[in-house]
Amino acid sequence: MSDVSSKEIYEVKKTLKELEDKKGRGTELVSVYIPPEKQISDVAKQMRDELGQSANIKSKQTRKNVQSAIEVIIQRLKLFPKPPEKGLVMFVGMIPKGGPGTEKMETYVFQPPEAVQTYTYHCDSQFFVEPLKQIIEYKEVYGVVVLDRKESTIATLRGKRIDIIKHLTSGVPGKHKAGGQSQRRFDRVIELAAHEFLKRIGRHVDEAFLPLKDELKGVLIGGPGHTKNDFVDGEYIHYEIHDKIINIVDTSYTGDFGIREVIDESADTLDEMDIMQEKKFMRKFLTGLISESGLSTYGEKEVRQNLQMGAVETLLISENLKSKRQTYTCPACNTVDVITTRQHQEPPEKRCPKCNEVMKITKTQETAEELIELAEEVKTHVEVISIETEEGTQLDKAFGGIAGILRYKVK
C-alpha cells in the first residue's frame, strides 16, 4: 500500500465523509464494488436482473428510485470495456434535499486507491462504505511479535488482514533437576541459549519491520511469562523499531493464536493511535513556533512558499479545510491569476491586470488537494488532522487549517 499517495487517501476520506452523510427516504441507495478481474458484461447482466426484481418493491416511489439508480449504473458501465486496474466503485441514488419531491440523483463513480477484493451489490437507505473504510485502514501497518522461550511468531497487521512473516523455535532446554555445580552450569547454558534466541528474534524483527519503518504505525509485543519483557528491555531490536512499541500484552498463547490474542487485547490502543499520531505532529509544530529553531510555519501563503522551496518536512492539513483555488485566464492575452475562495463562496469577477479584459475561470481545485500535490512533488510527508482533538481544533481555528514542520530554518 506504500504506493498509494496521500492525495488518494485524502480524496477517499473526503468522499467517505460525504457518502456517510447521505440518506435516502427508503432502501433506495445503490452501492456496487467491482473487482478488477470481474467481467463488465457479468455486472451489467446482474444489474438487468436487479432491475427486473425491483418491480416487486411495494412502495411506488422507492421502486421508481431504485430502478432509476440501476439504470444510471447500467449506462455508466457502458463507458468501461473492462474494470480499471484496481476495480470500480459506484454509489448511485436519489438524495432528498428537503421535503418530499426534492430528491436529486447523485452519482459517484471512481477507481479506489487499493484493489477491490469482492464483488458487492448493496441496496439500502445509506450507501455501503465499509469496504472503503478498510482501504484506508489497510494503509496503516502494525508490527506484531509474540514470544516465549520456546517459540516466536512475527506478523504484520494491515486493516483486518494479518500476514505471518516468520515463525521461530528456540531449542532452549527445559528445566533440569540435577543439583550442585551441574545445576548451575546447566542454568547458565539455558540462559545463554535464551539470550541467543532473543538475539535471533531481534534480527528477524529488524529484517521484517525496518523496510516498513516509514509506514509502520506501531509495534505490539506479547506472550506468556516474562520473556517478552526481557526482549523489550534488552537491546535486541533496532532503536527505530523499539521506539514504535505501543503495547506489551500478556497472552495465554504463542504462535498464530498468540498473534490474534495480542491484536484483540490491543484494540483500545489501536483506536487511540490515529489521535496520538496527530497529537505528536501538532505538538512538534507548536513547539517549533515558540522555540528558537523556528522550524514551524502556518498560513496558506507561507506554507505554499515553503513547499515550493522543498523546505517542509511535514505538511499538516485540517480535515475541515474548506477552500478552493480558482485559476483565472485572460482570453485576450493569456495572463493567469490564481486566488483562494471559501468552499461555497461565489467566485468573484476578475479583470486582467494587463488589458482589463474579463478573465475566465479555467480551473477549480480544492486547496488541500493542491497543497498535497505540491507536497508529494518534493517528498514531503502529509498528515490530515481531524478536529476531534484540542490540537486539531487549534489547527483549524487558530492557524487557518494549514501548517508545516520545516526541514530547516527559512530566512
From Swiss-Prot:
<comment type="subunit">
    <text>Heterodimer of two subunits, one of which binds GTP.</text>
</comment>
<dbReference type="InterPro" id="IPR024049">
    <property type="entry name" value="eRF1_1_sf"/>
</dbReference>
<keyword id="KW-0963">Cytoplasm</keyword>
<dbReference type="InterPro" id="IPR042226">
    <property type="entry name" value="eFR1_2_sf"/>
</dbReference>
<dbReference type="InterPro" id="IPR020918">
    <property type="entry name" value="Peptide_chain-rel_aRF1"/>
</dbReference>
<dbReference type="Pfam" id="PF03464">
    <property type="entry name" value="eRF1_2"/>
</dbReference>
<keyword id="KW-0648">Protein biosynthesis</keyword>
<dbReference type="InterPro" id="IPR004403">
    <property type="entry name" value="Peptide_chain-rel_eRF1/aRF1"/>
</dbReference>
<dbReference type="GO" id="GO:0005737">
    <property type="term" value="C:cytoplasm"/>
</dbReference>
<dbReference type="GO" id="GO:0016149">
    <property type="term" value="F:translation release factor activity, codon specific"/>
</dbReference>
<protein>
    <recommendedName>
        <fullName>Peptide chain release factor subunit 1</fullName>
    </recommendedName>
</protein>
<dbReference type="InterPro" id="IPR005141">
    <property type="entry name" value="eRF1_2"/>
</dbReference>
<comment type="similarity">
    <text>Belongs to the eukaryotic release factor 1 family.</text>
</comment>
<comment type="function">
    <text>Directs the termination of nascent peptide synthesis (translation) in response to the termination codons UAA, UAG and UGA.</text>
</comment>
<dbReference type="InterPro" id="IPR005142">
    <property type="entry name" value="eRF1_3"/>
</dbReference>
<dbReference type="Pfam" id="PF03463">
    <property type="entry name" value="eRF1_1"/>
</dbReference>
<dbReference type="Pfam" id="PF03465">
    <property type="entry name" value="eRF1_3"/>
</dbReference>
<dbReference type="InterPro" id="IPR005140">
    <property type="entry name" value="eRF1_1_Pelota"/>
</dbReference>
<dbReference type="InterPro" id="IPR029064">
    <property type="entry name" value="Ribosomal_eL30-like_sf"/>
</dbReference>
